[in-house]
Amino acid sequence: MVIMATSCGSDGVSSETVPQLPGRVTVPPEEPPVSTSPTVPPVTATTSPPPPTLPPSPYADRLPTFDVARPPAPLQMGLPVDQTQAAHLSRIETADPVAFITIDDGYVRHPEALALIRDSGVPVTLFLISSVAAEDPKFFSDIREQADATIQAHTVTHSRLKGRSYEAQRQEICGSADQLQGLFGTRPTLFRAPGGLQDPNTLAAAHDCGMKAVFFWREAVNDGRVQFQEGTRIQRGDVVLMHFRQTFVDDYLAALQSIKDAGLTPARLEDYLP
């Protein structure tokens, strides 16, 4: 004998007839429970596309190597206590075997600069003319983000400051810091006067614009040659000056090699200031 059973849904309407064998009871399939929770769409994992890979610098085989790219625990130099003027420095007093590479202006955006700085693996400080940086901010932001670079102030127009009024100098210094902050998101705290020419008004205006120090230099690199103010070797704590020029590759390689020959390693200037 075949027993016919019917099942009813929750609405009381009969569903399909299920045949049953003698001695066995077939239990109708249960309907899935009705969820009262809000429906959550499935989450699809997304990843941002990686930034384009920059090919190695064609000059990578000429880059000197350093045992340590930067000191693990740099010593901070105390600045002169003056409530009215920024400190004026050309070197850092430190016992660490380090020197500091600074690159000025920004007029010439050499196509090899980014790869060369990145592949060297050492920190650099860029003292940029803000109006020039504004012409191509991506060039400098790429160096900052893909290499090990910081950006500091070097006036708005690169005009001579020494001998000008406090207010005129303040407009150049504060104006450059304001513009660089707008371009790159971080306000500079260091300043270099064009040509290194400064006077008491420069130091006072720099202080009032929030600059910790105004930097000169001990060595300058031109046409692939390092020029020394004293002696024939870079000394520990020295600040080295070069520029964004057509000779950038030769100048940068010369600066690195001179630091290497002196038994020093490039370090980040900002790490040695409070």
Give residue ranges: language-model regions.
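N-terminal low-complexity, Pro/Thr-rich disordered segments
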Residues: 8-90
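Active-site beta->alpha N-cap acidic-glycine motif
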Residues: 58-153, 157-160, 179
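C-terminal domain-boundary segment and adjacent tail
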Residues: 81-94, 248-274
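Acidic-and-aromatic substrate-binding clefts and catalytic sites of carbohydrate-active enzymes
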Residues: 106-109, 128-138, 160-167, 192-198, ...
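His/Asp/Glu-enriched short active-site or ligand-binding loop at hydrolase and phosphoryl-transfer sites
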Residues: 187, 197-236, 266-273
